[in-house]
């Protein structure tokens, strides 16, 4: 559905974007605000959220942005974020779960279990809590859309990235579980799997070097993704043109999933050594 003014039909809806203070989350929130969506962004850093909100409204003077300082691994925080996102219009219409990260790097023989648990907690439990409480609001509103953010690392092995790939695979499965359960209430749940996307978090890679070269060699459409690539699909999945689409895991990666994950040897060998990367541990 494209309206007479060329918009996507999302104007005046209310959408919560977790992890909206930076990176893909900020890109999604900016794109939604440009469509006239009432956007609520949440994250753990209040100052970062304030800067993001200022940037979004500067770029989109007609947009409305609320901020909530919230940790998605804290259930009370998630409840508060969902409530805030519902206030402007009296209901919640959509959610994009961009909050995520990784605290584990290195060979499996050297992974720190506490860092592993924190990563799984953020990526899987945080997404679960967001789905749990946003779905309640969406069911009460008569339906809506949830868009989760996974990673190409959930399907293509990213060696030495520890819990990141396995936890994102959990997001994939959780998405389909929720879609199956919530379809009867007209709540759609779909997942976006970004490939290498230009954000501050991965600037060390996207600025150039052997890892980027390997990414490009294994990406049929050989360029780095932009947050606008992810935001465009998120808008579609939130909007009225996707009302019979649910339970889908969609790669936005230039085709990288057709080949293999990147070679991070040049990045991690100086840290762990060649023997360490193959699993050897000094006695």
Where are these regions (language model features)?
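Short C-terminal tail/terminal secondary-structure segment
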Residues: 4, 105, 235, 246-283
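Alpha-helical segment proximal to the catalytic Tyr-Lys
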Residues: 136, 180-184, 243
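Residue(s) in the substrate-gating loop at a strand-loop-helix junction
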Residues: 151
